[in-house]
Each structure stands twice: as structure tokens, then as C-alpha cells.
From Swiss-Prot:
UniProt protein name: Large ribosomal subunit protein bL28
GO biological process: translation
PANTHER family: 50S RIBOSOMAL PROTEIN L28, LARGE RIBOSOMAL SUBUNIT PROTEIN BL28A
Entry keywords, A to Z: Ribonucleoprotein, Ribosomal protein
Cross-referenced HAMAP family: Ribosomal_bL28
GO CC entries: ribonucleoprotein complex; ribosome
Pfam families: Ribosomal_L28
Taxonomic source organism: Lawsonia intracellularis (strain PHE/MN1-00)
Family: Belongs to the bacterial ribosomal protein bL28 family.
Amino acid sequence: MAKQCEICGKKPLVGNYVSHSNIKTKRVFNPNLQHMRNQFPDGRIKTITICTRCIRSGHVTKPSIHKGS
């Protein structure tokens, strides 16, 4: 699923560039997607593509860091 948030499903929207002379040209508004490692409740860790709103809202859990000895 390219250019789509795996949690909320946010994807690109279509809009227009509007010039000073009011000429409209199609454009795409892409969501701000980030790749982030997520720890699921069952303990497994997976890299997912999510939007920044889901990161700020706390829908993901960062995995704990274990340093080797």
C-alpha cells in the first residue's frame, strides 16, 4: 500500500493549483507518511508506514530498546 497510512487509511487527495489569473491545474496533496517500527500488543515488532497525525495521537507503540552485553 504505497502512499497510504496503515492505521487510518489516509491517502492522497486531488486538488488544484490556482494561479493569479485563476487558471486551475490539477495537483496531488500527499499525506505526510513516515516509516516507524511498531510493537504490537502480542510482542511482535514490524515496520509500518503511518501518517504523522497517527504518531502524534499515540496510535503506535515504539519498541523498547534492549542493549546487548
